[in-house]
UniProtKB/Swiss-Prot annotation:
Induction: By heparin and retinoic acid.
Coiled-coil region list: none
Origin organism lineage: Eukaryota, Metazoa, Chordata, Craniata, Vertebrata
Name of the featured protein: Pleiotrophin
Disulfide bonds: C47-C76, C55-C85, C62-C89, C99-C131, C109-C141
Organism encoding this protein: Homo sapiens
GO CC terms in record: endoplasmic reticulum; extracellular region; extracellular space; plasma membrane; protein-containing complex; Schaffer collateral - CA1 synapse
Length: 168
């Protein structure tokens, strides 16, 4: 009886050992198969940097729009693509829709030119846009207006009528 148990244990051990060897061989084959595959990826250094055009609004002169990008490279799969963009509507468009400036307060009115000016320094440039470091803008001086006498006289008339009603 002991001999039979011994034979069964040997068979179980041999089966487990063979299963272990089989698993090791399968894992080794899978790893070897991965190493043999040639690299299909194109190196990033073969493609040039993306160069983006200015943002072109879909409608009007601000809001949502698109820009086109191009890059060079013989092995590049994609050399052109379109990207969605947005031009803020509160930016000064005369200096470029992609350049944001921080402006100082308006200066005093120049009586010779009837203009007042202020300067702005570059705060931010979107998508590597080429922007001037400082810009100057001018606008006509506002007319110096005196308080309207009509407005004051209307107030006085109303107050006078109120006093008359109170006296009655």
């Amino acid at each position: 009886m002991q001999a039979q148990q011994y034979q069964q244990q040997r068979r179980k051990f041999a089966a487990a050992f063979l299963a272990f060897i089989f698993i090791l061989a399968a894992v080794d084959t899978a790893e070897a198969g991965k190493k043999e595959k040639p690299e299909k990826k194109v190196k990033k250094s073969d493609c040039g940097e993306w160069q983006w055009s200015v943002c072109v609004p879909t409608s009007g002169d601000c809001g949502l729009g698109t820009r086109e990008g191009t890059r060079t490279g013989a092995e590049c799969k994609q050399t052109m693509k379109t990207q969605r963009c947005k031009i803020p509507c509160n930016w000064k468009k005369q200096f470029g829709a992609e350049c944001k400036y921080q402006f100082q307060a308006w200066g005093e009115c120049d009586l010779n030119t009837a203009l007042k000016t202020r300067t702005g320094s570059l705060k931010r440039a979107l998508h590597n846009a080429e922007c001037q470091k400082t810009v100057t803008i001018s606008k006509p001086c506002g007319k110096l207006t005196k308080p309207k006498p009509q407005a004051e006289s209307k107030k006085k008339k109303k107050e006078g009528k109120k006093q008359e009603k109170m006296l009655d």
